[in-house]
Amino acid sequence: MIPRRSLLPMLVASLAGLSRFSVGADLQQFPTSELTIVSASGSHRFKVELAKTPAQMTQGLMFRTSLAPDAGMLFEYQQPTAATMWMRNTLIPLDMLFVDAQGRIVNIHERAVPQSLDVIGAAEPVRAVIELNGGTAARLGIEPGDRVIHPIFGNTS
């Protein structure tokens, strides 16, 4: 058992660590790009923020309270990798689309639960993960096998 007196300094230190994110001092800036997802229901354009650096990937969409309907984040890996995600400090539900090196969606995890520490991944290596508002994939009919058009996949047409 930890004495109550020792809990106060730990609590203050923990809150101090969290507060640096709330003031934006250490929050990453993200470049933006557009991508298109081609599905049986049509072509769907999104303006995405690009997470390329380890710091950007670590932060992702943490601490956001909303996301525009046509917005998202693209996590770009230099080589196909067994990417795993979680929802720590993420305040909104997200759909996670796992995309192979050819731009094909290989797995979709729909409506990931905010703040969950469950590990989410794909069964095969991916070149990218796209995070969209929770429910977007179902609403637009986006499914595994659909194509993502973006320069990182070499298929901009």
Predicted regions and their residues:
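Positively charged n-region of N-terminal signal peptides that target proteins for export
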Residues: M1-R5
